[in-house]
Amino acid sequence: MMFKNFPFFKGKKDTSFDHLVEEVKKGYIPEHIAIIMDGNGRWAKRRAMPRIAGHHEGMQVVKKITKFASKLNVKVLTLYAFSTENWKRPKKEVDYLMQLPEEFLGTFLPELIEENVQVRVIGQQDRLPTHTRRAMEKAMEETKENTGLILNFALNYGSRDEIVSAVQHMMKDSEEGKVRVEDVSEEMLSSYLMTSSLPDPELLIRTSGELRISNFMLWQIAYSEFWFTDVYWPDFTEEHLLNAITDFQHRGRRFGGV
């Protein structure tokens, strides 16, 4: 089921936000939340600002939502930062997007370390500029022992490409006698994906009002709950995330059963 903006906060204006957070934490919190962070460019356009201004503002929201997800005891937060299709955007915008990880981690990494957050990346890293790769590698190295929230960036990521790559590696292992055809299963294919060490997302959020998946974690979201909002990513708040989780808690997940 797909809902927009579950009205959890209506009639609760006199209740403190912190109390609401504690109430939500009494319920089941999705272990893995994935977010398609959409609408940065349109947010900027509405304000007669360049698109890169929207991306910069969106980066501030990443910091805020990461901290809040950690507070809620979410185990994995995957953020769709840059797709394999995003290279088609204007060069100036792409160049800025490739600078963002360096800028983001340059200012936020100490806080991530303090918050016990572990940074990971999925996607084709070999095509990223050297400075972008180095920034991500530094963050992963300095947080690899952290045991709190896993902040997983999907950077130059495309799900179809991921699945093709997984099948190619599986076929290579089969040719080398490491895999038998009769052994191939969902679990085996999952083990070849970039997310092999992570649970599948239980909740997928997309901002900006678009109702599509955009080649994001197609295998992993087979049983995810979807939550869409018209809010552009730079305007996304802790309250919106709490709304999404509360909506998730009110749904019945049957996994094909009755």
Swiss-Prot record:
Class of enzymatic activity (EC top level): transferase
Keywords of the record: Magnesium, Metal-binding, Transferase
Gene Ontology BP annotations: polyprenol biosynthetic process
Disulfide pairings: none
UniProt xrefs under Gene3D superfamilies: Decaprenyl diphosphate synthase-like
Named cofactor requirement(s): Mg(2+)
Pfam families (UniProt xref): Prenyltransf
GO molecular function, one term: manganese ion binding
Organism superkingdom: Bacteria
Gene Ontology, cellular component aspect: cytosol
Cofactor annotation remark: Binds 2 magnesium ions per subunit.
Oligomeric and partner information: Homodimer.
Protein name from the UniProt record: Isoprenyl transferase
Organism encoding this protein: Bacillus anthracis
Recorded name of the encoding gene: uppS
